[in-house]
C-alpha cells in the first residue's frame, strides 16, 4: 500500500530537545523504516522565522528526494509588508515551485475575514489545499472553524493537530462542512477511522504522521488494522492526498524491509499479531457506555468493545481499571465495573483496583482490599492525580503494604503534587517487593530521561509507554537507557485507540526479541510473580 504523509515538518526549531529528530535525513530514515512512499513537508523556519525565507529553504531540502518529498508553503495574509502583495504573485511563485498546498502557522495575525478574506478567496479559487492547526481555535474550536469554513465552502481544508478530547467539536464540523478533511496523527480516537468512514465516507480522511516528532509507524498502524476495505484503506493512506494535490505525490510503493521481523510482516498486512501482546494500561466504561461526560467520547468503550478491537490487531490480554474510578474518584463503583468484565472475559482481563483515601476511610480501604484482591483476584493498584494527594500520604500506606506483601504492581501517573518520579523511587525503596510502573514514560524525551534514571537506580521500577505524542524513537531510547526488560506496552484505551500505541512499538527500530519483551513478556512477568492472596 502506498503511504503518503500529509503532515510532516523538517528543519531547525526552537526549544527542541536534543534527542528530537528534525532533519531531512531523519525524516527520510523514518520514512524508510515505516515504509512510507512520500511526505508533504513544511520547513520549521517558515513556522518560527520568515515564511518566504523558510519556504526557500524547504525547496532546497526536498531536492534531496524530489520523488518522495513534496512542498507545503507557510503563508501570511496577502499585502503584508513581508509577504506577497497580490494573489497573482503568491500563486505564480507557488506554480513555479510546483507547490500545491499551504499552511497557515498560528501567530500574531488573525484569520478574520477582514485580514485573511482576500487570501482565502485566492486559495479557494485556485483549489489550494490549506492546512490549519487546531491551535488556531482557542477555547471554542467549533465556533472558530465553523465560521471560517462557512465563509469559504469550496476551500479544501486539512485540519491538523487536533486530539482525542476534541471529538465533539471535530465531529460536528465534519457533519456540517464537506470541505473539511482530517488526519489522525494526534486524533487517536477509539474506533474513529471506522466510524468516520461510515458516516462521512473515506474521501475526507487523510494519513498524517506529525513527523519528525511523532512515530510514523504509530500513524500507519491505525490504517493497517482498520476494519475497512482494501480500496478504502488505499484512499486514506495516500489516494485522497494525491487527489487534493491534483495528482502530485509519490508514484511507487516503498520497499518492504525487515523481512525477518514478524511483527512488521503481520502489521503491514493487517494480520493480528501472533506475538504475545499484553496491554499494561487500559480503562473501561460501564456496559453500553460511549463516553465519559461532557469532555470525552469513547466509542465502544465498554469491555466488549475493547476486547473486539484488541482482537482486530492481536492484543491478547489487557490490564484494566475503570475510567470513573481514578479520574472521577468513584473508586468502589469503578472497581465493580472491572470485576464484571473480569467475570465475563476470564484471564483475558487483569483487574486493576482503585483506592481513594479522600473518599474512603481506613476500614473502607481494608474492606475493598479484601474484596478485590483476596476474593476477586485483582493484581494491580492504581492511585491517581485527581485524588490531590502525595502518593506517600499515610492514607495509601496500608494499600502499599498489602501490595508489597503479595508482590503486586502499581501503575503510577505522576505529577509534582504526587511526589513525581522521585517519589516513586522512594516508594520502590520502601516497598521493594512491589513492581512500580511509571505511566506515560514515552510522552516526551525529557520525561523518558527522568524515568530511565529512576529505573537504573531502582530495578523494581518500570516504564510504561502510552501517550498521544507517540514520541519518535523514544521506545528505542528507553530500551537503550535501561534495558529491554523494563519497558512496557500500554494503550490508555478506550480514551485512545490501541492501534497507534501498538504501532509505536511494532515499527520501532528494535530486534524482534526486544519487541517481544516490550509488547508482552515483560508485563506478563510482573503479573505472574504476584502472590494471589
Where are these regions (language model features)?
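Mid-to-C-terminal alpha-helical segments outside catalytic/metal-binding sites
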Residues: 1-10, 20-38, 202-204, 215-276, ...
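A general structural detector for well-ordered alpha-helical segments in enzyme core domains, enriched
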Residues: 23-30, 54-62, 86-93, 118-119, ...
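Catalytic pocket-lining loop regions of alpha/beta-barrel enzymes
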Residues: 100-101, 108-207, 376-380, 388-489
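Mobile, glycine- and charge-enriched loop segments
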Residues: 1-17, 55, 59-75, 264-296, ...
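Active-site gating/metal-coordination segments in enzymes
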Residues: 37-38, 48, 52-131, 251, ...
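Acidic/glycine-enriched edge-of-secondary-structure segments
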Residues: 7-18, 42-45, 73, 130-132, ...
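Conserved, mostly hydrophobic/aromatic
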Residues: 7, 31, 58, 94, ...
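Active-site beta-loop-alpha junctions enriched in small/polar residues
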Residues: 9-11, 15, 44-46, 74-78, ...
